[in-house]
Amino acid sequence: MSSPRSFFWVQEYFTPWDYTARAVTRILAYRKTPFQEMLIAETGAFGKGLMLDGHWQSTTVDEFLYHEALVHPAMVQVVQAGGIPRRVLVLGGAEGATLREVLRWRSVEQVVMVDIDGEVVAACREHLPEMHQGSFEDPRVEVVIADALDFLQETGPIWDVILSDLSDPIESGPAYRLFTQEFFRQIRSKLQPDGAFTIQAGPTGPVELHQHTRIVRTLKTVFAAVQPYAIYAPTYGGPLGFALAAQDPISPRPEPEQIDQILSQQLDPERGALQFIDGITLLGLYQVPAHLRRAIAAETVVYTLDNPPRIE
């Protein structure tokens, strides 16, 4: 006689016709907050994971791929532009893993994390210590539970790096306004002249790359330099895009030795070595595939508050 099944399947839809299923073995936290539906669970293969509105945000097995790719290109860009990344603003990032990566940099004096959903932040703080690794307790960190737009309107142009670690811009979610031209103009106005901004910019697979190309197109109407790139992390079921934006030039072919030297000089060795990003990896990330370059060049849609991201 077979034993009762000790897991259940959680489906994540990428299009109305395609989904992946992940085995969940234990629910650690579940709730519907005023902003979104949250699940923190143990999975069969990917460790603990955070799901918001039916989409996996990260899992402990491969989150380093995402969070290192989000944080370190922008920090390196500031150094290459002649600046020092002292003050960093994180938008979203409830798991605390983005904080963890920022705090590796010895030059960092202040990190402010702004998240609209205090319930999700509290749940991640309790259930995902593998991700945040105590970063919420670092004296350089301040957590603000607020709308990112409201916070940006009140803060000054003091930030060396701004990182947008937000959930996908679905119409029913809390983040869709934060992918618009108006928001990116606010971001630009709050950066130091040699500052840098990185945003998680949607999937880049051929079936669903329109969101990525439109985010990149929108950024190019605001910033002088924009560098798209993408990673593959199994949690997401396909390639996931980012975009780095700045007013200073961004080299699409960074010298690996120079990047390695910057990382060696700037990162705190007591916080452990990076698992993903180094000079060769960064050079590879910036080599955008031909199909994606063509799609970005052909894109005409600009996201605005009157024409925000929509599910298609």
From Swiss-Prot:
NCBIfam families: MFS_SpdSyn (NF037959). It comes from the Bacteria. Catalyzes the irreversible transfer of a propylamine group from the amino donor S-adenosylmethioninamine (decarboxy-AdoMet) to putrescine (1,4-diaminobutane) to yield spermidine. HAMAP family: Spermidine_synth. Pathway: Amine and polyamine biosynthesis; spermidine biosynthesis; spermidine from putrescine: step 1/1. Transmembrane segments: none annotated. It holds the Pfam family Spermine_synt_N. Belongs to the spermidine/spermine synthase family. It is found in: Cytoplasm. Keywords: Cytoplasm, Polyamine biosynthesis, Spermidine biosynthesis, Transferase. Homodimer or homotetramer. InterPro entries: PABS, SAM-dependent_MTases_sf, Spermi_synthase, Spermidine_synt_N, Spermidine_synt_N_sf. GO terms for cellular component: cytoplasm. Its EC number is 2.5.1.16. One of its GO terms (molecular function) is spermidine synthase activity. S-methyl-5'-thioadenosine binds at residues 36, 115, 147-148, 174. SUPFAM superfamilies: S-adenosyl-L-methionine-dependent methyltransferases (SSF53335). The lineage of its organism: Bacteria, Bacillati, Cyanobacteriota, Cyanophyceae, Synechococcales. Residues 7-247 form the PABS domain. Spermidine binds at residues 67, 95. This is Polyamine aminopropyltransferase.
